[in-house]
């Protein structure tokens, strides 16, 4: 069942065939997101099967009828910024603690997703600087630590910066730029 803003729809093919968790052992529908013209539906490969580590995205029309599919994608392909599926489904496919593909870095907490911000409310993304990108985040208790890595070929190559945040994803303190060796011992 797909829950839309105005109704609930049954996921089905154009010939009327419907799907449920019992349809196959190799994948399950794990998320659906309403779009302007229907739904995007995420199928995740089941652990221990040939589809483990793979995902498939169906697009449907406004009645829940499948109109197209992505083909099977690896977790890396699914999380790539070009596809934007991490952001679309709010899932961390590569387990780096970040939700990629949106207009700002998002941190995956144990119970919610938080936008990384500075004290004035400004947000950051891969487009914020050509010198660095956030590459990982880790929840520490109710707070986060976010790793920024210097971009290859820039003055920050080989350097890293670790930002600590509060429980809402607001940056509270930073490590300063550390070499790779200093980061390992941090």
Regions found by a protein language model. Give the residues of each.
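Long, low-complexity, Gly/Thr
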Residues: 1-186
């Amino acid at each position: 069942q797909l829950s839309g803003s105005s109704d609930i729809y049954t996921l089905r093919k154009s010939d009327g065939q419907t799907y449920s968790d019992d349809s196959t052992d190799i994948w399950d529908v794990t998320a659906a997101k309403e779009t302007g013209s229907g739904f995007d539906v995420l199928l995740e490969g089941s652990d221990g099967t040939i589809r483990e580590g793979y995902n498939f995205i169906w697009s449907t029309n406004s009645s829940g009828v499948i109109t197209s599919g992505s083909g099977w994608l690896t977790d890396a392909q699914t999380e790539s910024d070009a596809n934007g599926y991490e952001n679309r489904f709010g899932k961390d496919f590569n387990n780096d603690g970040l939700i990629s593909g949106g207009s700002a870095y998002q941190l995956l907490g144990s119970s919610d997703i938080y936008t990384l911000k500075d004290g004035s409310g400004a947000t950051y993304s891969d487009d914020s600087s050509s010198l660095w990108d956030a590459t990982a985040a880790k929840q520490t208790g109710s707070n986060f630590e976010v790793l920024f890595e210097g971009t290859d070929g820039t003055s920050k190559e080989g350097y890293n910066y670790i930002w600590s945040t509060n429980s809402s994803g607001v940056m509270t303190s930073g490590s300063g730029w550390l070499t790779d060796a200093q980061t390992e011992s941090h």
